[in-house]
C-alpha cells in the first residue's frame, strides 16, 4: 500500500497530529507491525486517509504476523473469515471478541475488537474502525504474533524467589486477550513484551545505563546505610537493591531473582512508603505470573532506566517480604484494570492512569505528598504551537531538605499530557512537548506523573496561522466583538444611505399612519444612559453599546417610515446581500422585529442566499430573537435556497442543529411542523382543522409540584407527541391530495366505465391502507396503555401462549376429525356426479383460472404523472424534512441539556408573545 500526493495535507491532522504523508511514514509503520501495535493516533490517521491506501476486496487467507489490511465493512462483510481458528465463546460457535473505545486526547474516536488464536494463544488480531459515522465503514485489521509464553504458570514459585528480597520492577503490558461479553469475565494474559512500541528486548543498549544506575542507587542508599547497615531504609519508598547485586546475577536466569544474588543481598530491602502500604493492591504482581517472565536478568537495568519514549510501557513495582519479615507469600489476587490502549495494569483505583498518557511514566520513587519540593524559576518558552512538537526548558531548584532528589527522573505535566524530562544539568530540565488542544493549561513538575512537587504555572498552546485547525476553532471574544462591530457598521450604512424620491400623497398618508404606530424612543432610556455616565465608578463600554443601539433604533424607525412613503414592497439588501432585518437578527436587536411588523414588511424576507431573519437567529443560537420572531408571526417551516451540500435546502431547525443548539432545533422543528399543518388547514389542503388535532397543550396546574428535571421530561414528551401528530396529519393530507390527482388523471385518460372501476379500486386500496394505519396506531396506543407494568405484560404473554396452544390443539383436532369426511365427499362428487352422470372430466380436468388483476393503461400513466415530476421531487424533500423534524424533537430524550434549552426557549416564546400582544394593543390605542 502506498500513499498518493505525499506532500498534500492529511485529513484530520488536527486530531492525529500528522500533517503530511511523510510525517505518518506508513512504510515504517508496516515494517514495525510485527513488533508492536499501532497507536490510536496512527490508526486514526490511516483510517481517515484510507483513500491513499489499498482497500482489499476479499479477505486475506491465513495472514501472518505483522499483516495490516484495510477493508470496506459494507462491501467485505466477512472480513473476519481469514482462515485462522480463533478462540470461541462457551457456545463453541461465536468468536470470543472483547472490544473497547480508544481515546485520542480527551475524546473517544476509535473502536477496537480483540481476538485470540485458539491453536496458537500467542497470535492476536485487532480490528479498528472510527466512531465517526462518515468513516466507520473502513476497518483496519492488524495481526501480530507476540513473544509471550503461557501466563498461567503454576501457583508455586521457586523457593529461592521467596528467600531473597528483590526489585520487582517488571516492564510489561498485555493486550486484552479475551473477554466474555455475556458474563463480563476477562481472562488475562501476561506477555513478556506487548506494547505500542513492541516492548523492550535485551540488547547491548542495556549496559549503557550501568554507570548512571550505580550513581542513582548509591545516592539513594548512602544516607540510609550510615544510619543502619543492616536495614536500608529509603526516603523515597519502594524496594531497592544495589546495581552491583543486579550486575552479579547470571545473564540467562530463568527467574527474576536467583540464588546468586542471595549471598550478596542486603538483608532487608523491603521498603514501602506509607501511601503504598495503605494501598494493598498497588505495585504487587501475582505470583502465578512469575513463570511467564523469562530472561529478565538481562533486562533489569534497562527496565529501571525507563524508556520514556514508549507510549504504553509501564513499570509495575512489587513489594516482596524478606525472610526477616516472616512472610514470603505474594498476594494471588491483584486488582487489574485496562487503559485505552487495551493494556492491563496491576494498580489500585487510586493510582494514576499512566497508560493514557502519550509517554509512559514509571511508578513513584518519592513519597506522595502535597508539599512543594521544588521552586520553578523560569520556563522557556511559555507557549507552544498546538500542532507541533516543541522543546521546553525549565529551570528550578529543590529546597534544602530535598536536595538529594535533584538527580531523580523528572516529569512535566502539561494539562493532561505527561512528558518525561531530560536532565541537562542540576536544576535544568528539558521537555519535548507534543501536540495538544489549543488554549491555556496547567503545568507542574512531578516525580510520579501525578503528584505536583512544584507550584502550578500556566502554559499556552497557540494555533499556527494558516493551519486547518485555525478555521475550526470557535471564535474568540475579540473575533466576536469584531464581527458584531462589522454588522453594526453595515446596518448603519444601510440605514443612513439616503435616496430622495418623490412621495405620492396616498403613500404619504400611509407613512403617517405607520409613524403614529411607532412610538418615539421613551425619555426614560435616555435618562438611564445619562445616570450611568454620571456615575464616576461606572464603565463606559456598555454605555457606548447602548447609545449606539438607541441611535440605530431611532434611525430604523425613520428609515422604515421612508420606505413605506416611497412605496417599497421590501426593505432591500446591502452590498453583501443581507437586509436590515437580517443584520438586526444577527445582532440580537429584538426591538427591531416589532418595528418591521408594524410597518407591514414581511418578517420572512429572504437575503441573497434565501435565509430569513429566523434562519440567522437560529444559526447563531439567539433564543430571545427566535422567540420574538415566532411571536411576531415568522414562519419556521421555510427552507433556504438549495446548495451543493444541501440540495433540498435547510430549515431553521437544521441550521440550529448544525451549530449544536439541540434544544432550540427541537423547538423550531416542532413549531415548523405545526405551522405547516396549520397552513395546509387554512388553504383547505386537509379536512382536519388545527383545532381538531390532538396537539398536546401542557396544563401548568398539573405540573406545579414537579421538579425541573421531571418538568423538562414532561414537556419533551408533549413536544414529541405534537411533532409526531403534526407529521402524521401532514402526510395523510399529502396522500389524500395524491389520490385526488390520480383520480382526476384516470378519469380524463380512460373511458367512463373503465375509469370508474379503476377509481373505485384505488379508493378501496387507499381506504384499506388508512384503515391498517389507524388500526396499527390504535393497537400501539392500546399496547402502551395496557403494558406499562411488568406484571401486566407478564400476564399477557402467559395468556397469549396458552391461547395459542389451545387454538392449535383445537384446530388440529377439527382438521383430523373432518379430514376423512371431506375426502370421501369430494370423491363422491367427482366420480358419481361429474364423471359418471355429467360425463365430464371431473375436478382433475378443471383448469385453474388465472386471477383477474386490474391493470392501468401504461400509455395513460405518463400523461398523468408527467406534470407531477417536480411536484413528486418536492414532496419527497418535504417528507424528508418532516421526518428530520420529528427526529430532532425525539433527540431531546438523549440530552438533559437540550431539554433545558427547549424549556428555556418555550418560556421565552411565551413571554415574547405577551410582550408583542401588549405592544400591538398599545399601537391600536394610539391609532
From Swiss-Prot:
GO cellular component terms, A-Z: nucleus
Keyword Metal-binding belongs to the record: no
Each ANK repeat, start to end: 609-638
DNA-binding region: 26-152
Molecular-function annotations in GO: calmodulin binding; double-stranded DNA binding; sequence-specific DNA binding; transcription coregulator activity
Motif (Nuclear localization signal): 72-79
Keywords: Activator, ANK repeat, Calcium, Calmodulin-binding, DNA-binding, Nucleus, Repeat, Transcription, Transcription regulation
Domain of life of the source: Eukaryota
Location of this chain's protein in the cell: Nucleus
SUPFAM superfamilies the UniProt entry points to: Ankyrin repeat (SSF48403), E set domains (SSF81296), P-loop containing nucleoside triphosphate hydrolases (SSF52540)
Region described as Necessary and sufficient for nuclear localization: 70-96, 830-851
Predominant location category: nucleus
InterPro entries, alphabetized: Ankyrin_rpt, Ankyrin_rpt-contain_sf, CG-1_dom, Ig-like_fold, Ig_E-set, IQ_motif_EF-hand-BS, P-loop_NTPase
Reported regulation of activity: Transcriptional activation activity is strongly reduced by calmodulin.
Calmodulin-binding: region residues: 826-845
GO biological process: positive regulation of DNA-templated transcription; regulation of transcription by RNA polymerase II
Domain IQ: 757-786, 799-828, 882-911
Gene3D superfamilies: 1.20.5.190, Ankyrin repeat-containing domain, Immunoglobulins
Family: Belongs to the CAMTA family.
Described purpose of this protein according to its UniProt entry: Transcription activator that binds calmodulin in a calcium-dependent manner in vitro. Binds to the DNA consensus sequence 5'-T[AC]CG[CT]GT[GT][GT][GT][GT]T[GT]CG-3'.
Name used for this protein in its record: Calmodulin-binding transcription activator CBT
Source species of the chain: Oryza sativa subsp. japonica
Gene name linked to the record: CBT
Amino acid at each position: 500500500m502506498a500513499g498518493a500526493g505525499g506532500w498534500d495535507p492529511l485529513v484530520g491532522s488536527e486530531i492525529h497530529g500528522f500533517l503530511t504523508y511523510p510525517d505518518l511514514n506508513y512504510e515504517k509503520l508496516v515494517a514495525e507491525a510485527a513488533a508492536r501495535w499501532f497507536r490510536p493516533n496512527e490508526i486514526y490517521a490511516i483510517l481517515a486517509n484510507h483513500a491513499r491506501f489499498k482497500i482489499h476486496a476479499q479477505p486475506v487467507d491465513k495472514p501472518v504476523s505483522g499483516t495490516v489490511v484495510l477493508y470496506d465493512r459494507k462491501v467485505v462483510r466477512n472480513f473476519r473469515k481469514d482462515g485462522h481458528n480463533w478462540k470461541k465463546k462457551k457456545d463453541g460457535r461465536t468468536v470470543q471478541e472483547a472490544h473497547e473505545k480508544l481515546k485520542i486526547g480527551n475524546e473517544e474516536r476509535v473502536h477496537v475488537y480483540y481476538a485470540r488464536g485458539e491453536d496458537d494463544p500467542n497470535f492476536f488480531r485487532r480490528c479498528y474502525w472510527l466512531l465517526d459515522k462518515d468513516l466507520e465503514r473502513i476497518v483496519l485489521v492488524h495481526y501480530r504474533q507476540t513473544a509471550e509464553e503461557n501466563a498461567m504458570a503454576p501457583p508455586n514459585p521457586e523457593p529461592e524467589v521467596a528467600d531473597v528480597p528483590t526489585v520487582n520492577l517488571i516492564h510489561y503490558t498485555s493486550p486484552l486477550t479475551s473477554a466474555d461479553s455475556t458474563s463480563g469475565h476477562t481472562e488475562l494474559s501476561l506477555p513478556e513484551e506487548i506494547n505500542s512500541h513492541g516492548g523492550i528486548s535485551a540488547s547491548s543498549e542495556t549496559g549503557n545505563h550501568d554507570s548512571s544506575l550505580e550513581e542513582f542507587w548509591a545516592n539513594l542508599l548512602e544516607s540510609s546505610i550510615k544510619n543502619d547497615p543492616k536495614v536500608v531504609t529509603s526516603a523515597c519508598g519502594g524496594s531497592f537493591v544495589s546495581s552491583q547485586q543486579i550486575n552479579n546475577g547470571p545473564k540467562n536466569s530463568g527467574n527474576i531473582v536467583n540464588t546468586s544474588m542471595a549471598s550478596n543481598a542486603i538483608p532487608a530491602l523491603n521498603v514501602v512508603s506509607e501511601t503504598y502500604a495503605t494501598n494493598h493492591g498497588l505495585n504487587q504482581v501475582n505470583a502465578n505470573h512469575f513463570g511467564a517472565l523469562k530472561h529478565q536478568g538481562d533486562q533489569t537495568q534497562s527496565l529501571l532506566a525507563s524508556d520514556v519514549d514508549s507510549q504504553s510501557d509501564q513499570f509495575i513495582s512489587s513489594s516482596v517480604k524478606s525472610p526477616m519479615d516472616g512472610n514470603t507469600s505474594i498476594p494471588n489476587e491483584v486488582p487489574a484494570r485496562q487503559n485505552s490502549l487495551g493494556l492491563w495494569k496491576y494498580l489500585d483505583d487510586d493510582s494514576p492512569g499512566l497508560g493514557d498518557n502519550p509517554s509512559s511514566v514509571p511508578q513513584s520513587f518519592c513519597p506522595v505528598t502535597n508539599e512543594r519540593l521544588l521552586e520553578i524559576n523560569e520556563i522557556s518558552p511559555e507557549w507552544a504551537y498546538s500542532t507541533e512538537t516543541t522543546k521546553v526548558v525549565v529551570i528550578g531548584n529543590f529546597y534544602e531538605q530535598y536536595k538529594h532528589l535533584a538527580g531523580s527522573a523528572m516529569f512535566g505535566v502539561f494539562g493532561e499530557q505527561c512528558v518525561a524530562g531530560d536532565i541537562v544539568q542540576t536544576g535544568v530540565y528539558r521537555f519535548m512537548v507534543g501536540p495538544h488542544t489549543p488554549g491555556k493549561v496547567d503545568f507542574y513538575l512531578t516525580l510520579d506523573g501525578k503528584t505536583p512537587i512544584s507550584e502550578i504555572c500556566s502554559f499556552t498552546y497557540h494555533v499556527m496561522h494558516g493551519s486547518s485547525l485555525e478555521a475550526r476553532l470557535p471564535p474568540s471574544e475579540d473575533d466576536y466583538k469584531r464581527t458584531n462591530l462589522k454588522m453594526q457598521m453595515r446596518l448603519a450604512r444601510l440605514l443612513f444611505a439616503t435616496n430622495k424620491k418623490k412621495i405620492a400623497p396616498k403613500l404619504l398618508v400611509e407613512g403617517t399612519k405607520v409613524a403614529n404606530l411607532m412610538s418615539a424612543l421613551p425619555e426614560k432610556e435616555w435618562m438611564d444612559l445619562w445616570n450611568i455616565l454620571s456615575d464616576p465608578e461606572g464603565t463606559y463600554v456598555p454605555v457606548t453599546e447602548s447609545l449606539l443601539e438607541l441611535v440605530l433604533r431611532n434611525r430604523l424607525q425613520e428609515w422604515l417610515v421612508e420606505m413605506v412613503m416611497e412605496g417599497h414592497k421590501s426593505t432591500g439588501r446591502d452590498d453583501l446581500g443581507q437586509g436590515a432585518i437580517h443584520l438586526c437578527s444577527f445582532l440580537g436587536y429584538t426591538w427591531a422585529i416589532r418595528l418591521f411588523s408594524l410597518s407591514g414588511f414581511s418578517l420572512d424576507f429572504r437575503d441573497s442566499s434565501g435565509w430569513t431573519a429566523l434562519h440567522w437567529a437560529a444559526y447563531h443560537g439567539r433564543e430571545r430573537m427566535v422567540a420574538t420572531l415566532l411571536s411576531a408571526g415568522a414562519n419556521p417551516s421555510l427552507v433556504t435556497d438549495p446548495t451543493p451540500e444541501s440540495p433540498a435546502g435547510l430549515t431553521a431547525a437544521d441550521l440550529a442543529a448544525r451549530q449544536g443548539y439541540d434544544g432550540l432545533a427541537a423547538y423550531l422543528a416542532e413549531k415548523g411542523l405545526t405551522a405547516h399543518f396549520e397552513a395546509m388547514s387554512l388553504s383547505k389542503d386537509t379536512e382536519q382543522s388545527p383545532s381538531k388535532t390532538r396537539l398536546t397543550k401542557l396544563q401548568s396546574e398539573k405540573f406545579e409540584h414537579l421538579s425541573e428535571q421531571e418538568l423538562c421530561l414532561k414537556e419533551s414528551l408533549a413536544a414529541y407527541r405534537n411533532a409526531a401528530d403534526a407529521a402524521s396529519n401532514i402526510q395523510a393530507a399529502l396522500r389524500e391530495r395524491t389520490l385526488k390527482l390520480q383520480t382526476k388523471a384516470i378519469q380524463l385518460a380512460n373511458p367512463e366505465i373503465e375509469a370508474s372501476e379503476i377509481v373505485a379500486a384505488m379508493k378501496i386500496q387507499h381506504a384499506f391502507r388508512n384503515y391498517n394505519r389507524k388500526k396499527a396506531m390504535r393497537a400501539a396506543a392500546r399496547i402502551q396503555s395496557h403494558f406499562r407494568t411488568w406484571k401486566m405484560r407478564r400476564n399477557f404473554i402467559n395468556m397469549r401462549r396458552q391461547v395459542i396452544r389451545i387454538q392449535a390443539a383445537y384446530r388440529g383436532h377439527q382438521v383430523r376429525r373432518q379430514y376423512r369426511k371431506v375426502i370421501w365427499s369430494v370423491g363422491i362428487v367427482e366420480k358419481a356426479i361429474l364423471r359418471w352422470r355429467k360425463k365430464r372430466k371431473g375436478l382433475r380436468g378443471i383448469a385453474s383460472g388465472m386471477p383477474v388483476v386490474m391493470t392501468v393503461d401504461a400509455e395513460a400513466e405518463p400523461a398523468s404523472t408527467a406534470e407531477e415530476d417536480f411536484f413528486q421531487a418536492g414532496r419527497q424533500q418535504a417528507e424528508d424534512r418532516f421526518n428530520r423534524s420529528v427526529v430532532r424533537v425525539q433527540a431531546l430524550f438523549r440530552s438533559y441539556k437540550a431539554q433545558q434549552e427547549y424549556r428555556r426557549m418555550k418560556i421565552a416564546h411565551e413571554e415574547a408573545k405577551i410582550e408583542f400582544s401588549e405592544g400591538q394593543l398599545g399601537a391600536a390605542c394610539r391609532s
